[in-house]
Regions:
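Short beta-to-alpha linker loops that shape the active-site pocket of alpha/beta-hydrolase fold enzymes
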Residues: 1, 20, 81, 116
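NAD(P)H-binding glycine-rich loop region in Rossmannoid oxidoreductase-like domains
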Residues: 4-62, 66-69
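Hydrophobic, well-structured mid-protein blocks that either form specific transmembrane helices
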Residues: 51-98
Length: 190
């Protein structure tokens, strides 16, 4: 399905490129102040580790570097709750490594969005995601205090939070999790 087919805003331009080849898209980045990156394979267990790393780490870091070379000053990146370059858990280690690579580029503002469970409108990954899509709405109210960072968020709400956050003033490196997503959506913080 083509998620962009209904977008009619005259300010939008559509370019079909290989996201793993910065040479195909870098010229389109010039003149933009902010870049949003949600590149990733999603369910890491469905792909070989090399492919996951090629997309989620190298592809994302290459996009960030291309943005920086073209003068983008604000980079907003979707990673994952618990992202940590030193983690023994492969998925969160890769997410932590990409955060470190983005930080090293020296953007005036780098915002890392770390959701736990992304609630998608459809099940794209099979049985496991189907279970999580069913259970998380029931479990979310039990995740309080420090556990609230593991609450789910819909893709739509996360997208709104990212855009609203980009529109607010800020600088440096920022990490946003569930609590901060909610504050941005309410217009009260982050």
């Amino acid at each position: 399905p083509d998620a962009l087919k209904d977008l009619k805003d005259p300010r939008l331009e559509r370019h079909v490129v290989d996201v793993l080849d910065a040479g195909q898209y870098e010229r389109f980045l010039a003149g933009h102040g902010a870049a949003f990156c949600t590149l990733g394979l999603g369910e890491p267990s469905k792909f070989p580790r090399e492919e996951f790393k090629k997309v989620d780490l190298d592809g994302t870091a290459d996009f960030a570097a291309a943005c920086r070379r073209q003068g983008v000053t604000q980079f907003l990146l979707l990673t994952a709750v618990g992202a940590d370059a030193k983690s023994s858990i492969y998925y969160v280690r890769i997410k932590g490594e990409v955060e470190e690579r983005v930080k090293a580029l020296g953007f005036a503002r780098a915002s890392f969005f770390r959701p736990s469970m992304l609630m998608t409108p459809t099940n794209r990954y099979g049985f496991t995601q189907g279970v999580f899509l069913t259970l998380f709405p029931l479990i979310d109210p039990l995740l309080v205090g420090p556990l609230s960072r593991f609450r789910s968020i819909t893709v739509s709400d996360l997208g709104k939070a990212m855009v609203r956050h980009a529109e607010r003033p800020g600088a440096g490196v920022e990490v946003l999790e569930w609590k901060e997503f909610q504050a941005v959506l309410r217009g009260t913080g982050a």
